[in-house]
């Protein structure tokens, strides 16, 4: 069964096993780790473990490794390296082709192809696929498609082997192949730092490791330039639109230097100048800083300052008495408006740009309804939008009008290389007279640039949001910069209306925002604190609340309850919470299929969240013929069916049904628990907030607590440490964001 190559490593004998893959017991799609059952050359069955990217049934393999004894599973062959050989026997070829590798070839057709062409099968698939049409039932078109798929699979397997050999995630394969096709390996060998492109989301050190393995110079211009671009791009995720040059130089030199290699500031400055000359960067003195921008960020910020300043100065004249119209409308309205609400409605009628801000219970929604009534009376065609699907649905429910996400409004799509493009733009503007945009605190400057670019000339824009909530995940602090620039007419609603005063959720949200401790409700209230400290106790209490106590005592279904946490991994973060909640709310069952992907098990009935924008996913409306494309970051759905043979699953997002292939599962996370950041823009009947010890201090801030509280409509339960709650209330630090939008708006006013 085995032979060995005559050497030892670390006192272990390294042996060689040759065999054919009979069963794939376990496969991790993210890193290619697998447990295989092999039929060895002498007929014995071998269990092998190791990294086998894109391994298929029927493949002949040569494994190098050693025997180990697993405490549960017994003797296994731990593989250190392997070579693959395509099968040469008719049976092996049929098994390989019929394993689901190629869409349209099942076991029967695979057997026919193998029998017809024998050991020449793979050569024909690669070079003469049209010959497949010699078989009954295969058209010329199908033959070419089978050949295309086989060629693509072969090229992707080579790429996977290259990535695996160099310790890079094999999950990069489809991304690299989609952009670079069969030239991916050559491109990586020429410039490993292309992996630092945000499209691939690879840590710089991994790309650096590949460069060192390939023998490239660690003082090369390519490495320095890549380090600068990586640092600037990485800091977009921290909300910065630029970085002061002195901080950039320090960060780049730290990134690129070690005990053996020193990259000094002079070399980094030359890199900045080089990239500026190529048009990749902009260096500018603004807001009292020597600022370095990525070109796109600079252009977005400058464009917004120019356009918003222009819109803020635009006033509308009418050939009738607007005050009389407003007075008549407000008197006849079913709503009663405060003086500030009336001021907001009047300002929106007269100005090209207006901001409406305020906390919970201050009447923002009622004011929006009043603005809509006035816009209708003025004959304006108005569109409603919000950053996320849930926020758009909530806006639609509250106003009775259709509301779309910004991406849907602008008809977003993908260009080559994964770039987002919008069909609506200055050359194809929106068909409207006004846009009302809700939850503006979530919107970063790049998305805002796209919206402003798509507004028709003369259109009004009403921005609605709570400036005390979390800033956007992306670059900039758009809403706060606009308000503090004092360039844009802003109405801040501060009066808490009587009905809202009856809610302890609303009153405690305002208390926290003012730096005061929240007060738990009495027995019939809507705000409770359950004191627990250690993560295990918090997580178990949360699971009991969701599975038993809240459904039993309040009648909430699990779908009406959302668990929130400030963090993902630490303490009572969403990852350990989701594992326990899945176990409590959707345990394994013979009637439910499941798919393991990395460390996550996806099961029929699971609640999941899309964690990146995907403009290509096709969806159908339930009970309707309507079709569309695109599922976006933050969309929450339920897995309704898993199809192992077809390697796909079907997910329902509200009234839309979408199919995900298994190689797309890196875009999904379990969503029984989500971070407070991910929850922004949504409201839930019941919120359970997990605040154990051990959460990262940088996430224990007042505005995170305030944002979490304001997600709850009918019930909020904090399960956690009193000390953590107190720390968050007293911690009013807001992370510094380097942005010059406010400075540009003020500068434009003086010119």
Question: Which residues are covered by each model-predicted region?
Answer:
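Pre-P-loop entry segment of helicase/translocase ATPase cores
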Residues: 164, 233-237, 280-343
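Short aromatic-glycine-enriched beta-strand elements
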Residues: 27-38, 645-650
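ASCE P-loop NTPase helicase motor core
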Residues: 242, 342-345, 350-524
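Loop/turn positions that initiate beta-strands
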Residues: 58-60, 605, 634
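Structural detector for short beta-strands of small beta-barrel domains
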Residues: 13-28, 65, 636-640
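Accessory alpha-helical DNA-binding modules that contact the DNA backbone or grooves
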Residues: 12, 33-41, 47-48, 56-288, ...
């Amino acid at each position: 069964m085995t032979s060995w190559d005559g050497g030892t490593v670390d006192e272990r004998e390294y042996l060689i096993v040759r065999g054919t893959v009979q069963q794939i017991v376990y496969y991790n799609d993210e890193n290619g780790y697998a447990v295989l059952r092999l039929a060895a050359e002498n007929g014995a069955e071998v269990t092998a473990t190791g990294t086998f990217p894109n391994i298929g049934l029927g493949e002949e393999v040569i494994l190098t490794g050693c025997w180990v004894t697993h405490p549960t599973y017994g003797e296994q062959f731990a593989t250190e390296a392997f070579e693959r050989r395509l099968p040469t026997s008719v049976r092996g070829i049929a098994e390989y082709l019929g394993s689901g590798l190629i869409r349209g070839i099942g076991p029967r057709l695979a057997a026919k192809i193998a029998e017809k062409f024998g050991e020449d099968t793979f050569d024909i698939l690669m070079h003469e696929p049209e010959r497949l049409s010699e078989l009954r039932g295969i058209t010329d078109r199908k033959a070419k498609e089978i050949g295309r798929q086989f060629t693509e699979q072969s090229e992707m397997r080579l790429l996977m082997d290259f990535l695996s050999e160099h310790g890079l995630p094999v999950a990069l394969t489809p991304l690299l192949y989609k952009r670079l096709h069969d030239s991916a390996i050559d491109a990586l060998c020429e410039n490993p730092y292309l992996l630092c492109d945000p499209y691939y989301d690879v840590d710089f050190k991994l790309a650096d490791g590949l460069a060192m393995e390939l023998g490239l110079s660690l003082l090369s211009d390519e490495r320095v330039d890549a380090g600068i671009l990586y640092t600037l791009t990485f800091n977009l995720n921290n909300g910065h639109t630029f970085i002061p040059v002195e901080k950039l130089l320090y960060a780049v030199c730290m990134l690129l230097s070690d005990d053996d290699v020193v990259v000094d500031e002079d070399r980094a400055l030359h890199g900045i100048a080089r990239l500026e000359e190529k048009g990749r960067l902009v260096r500018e003195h603004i807001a009292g800083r020597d600022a370095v921008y990525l070109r796109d960020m600079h252009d977005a910020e400058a464009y917004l300052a120019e356009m918003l300043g222009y819109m803020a100065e635009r006033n509308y004249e009418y050939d009738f008495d607007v005050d009389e119209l407003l007075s008549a409308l407000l008197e006849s309205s079913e709503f009663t408006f405060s003086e500030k609400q009336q001021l907001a409605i009047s300002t929106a009628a007269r100005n090209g740009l207006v901001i409406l801000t305020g906390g919970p219970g201050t009447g923002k929604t009622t004011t929006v309804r009043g603005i809509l009534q006035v816009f209708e009376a003025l004959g304006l065609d108005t569109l409603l939008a919000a950053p996320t699907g849930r926020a758009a649905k909530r806006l639609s429910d509250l106003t009775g009008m259709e509301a779309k996400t910004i991406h849907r409004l602008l008809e977003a799509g993908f260009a080559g290389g994964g770039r987002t493009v919008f069909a609506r733009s200055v050359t194809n503007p929106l068909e409207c007279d006004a846009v009302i945009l809700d939850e503006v605190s979530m919107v970063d400057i790049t998305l805002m640039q796209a919206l402003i670019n798509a507004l028709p000339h003369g259109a009004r824009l009403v921005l609605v949001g709570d400036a005390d909530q979390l800033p956007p995940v992306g670059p900039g602090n758009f809403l706060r910069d606009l308000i503090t620039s004092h360039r844009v007419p802003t109405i801040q609603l501060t009066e808490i209306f009587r009905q809202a005063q009856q809610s302890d959720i609303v009153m405690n949200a305002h208390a926290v925002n003012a730096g005061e401790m929240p007060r738990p409700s009495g027995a019939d209230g809507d705000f409770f604190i359950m004191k627990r400290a250690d993560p295990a106790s918090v997580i178990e209490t949360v699971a009991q609340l969701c599975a038993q106590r809240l459904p039993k005592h309040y009648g909430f279904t699990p779908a009406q309850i959302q668990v929130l946490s400030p963090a993902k991994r630490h303490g009572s973060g969403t990852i350990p919470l989701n594992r326990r909640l899945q176990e409590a709310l959707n345990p394994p069952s013979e009637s439910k299929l499941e798919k393991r992907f990395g460390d996550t098990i996806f099961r029929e009935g699971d609640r999941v969240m899309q964690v990146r924008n995907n403009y290509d996913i096709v969806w159908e409306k339930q009970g309707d013929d309507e079709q569309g494309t695109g599922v976006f970051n933050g969309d929450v759905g339920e897995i309704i069916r898993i199809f192992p043979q077809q390697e796909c699953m079907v997910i329902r997002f509200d009234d839309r049904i979408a199919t995900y292939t298994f190689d797309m599962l890196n875009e999904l996370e379990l969503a029984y628990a989500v971070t407070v950041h991910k929850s922004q823009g949504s409201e839930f009947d019941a919120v359970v907030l997990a605040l154990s010890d051990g959460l990262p201090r940088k996430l224990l801030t007042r505005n995170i607590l305030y944002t979490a509280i304001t997600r709850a409509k009918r019930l909020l339960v904090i399960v956690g440490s009193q000390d953590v709650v107190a720390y968050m209330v007293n911690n009013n630090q807001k992370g510094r964001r380097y942005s010059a939008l406010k400075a540009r708006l003020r500068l434009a006013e003086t010119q």
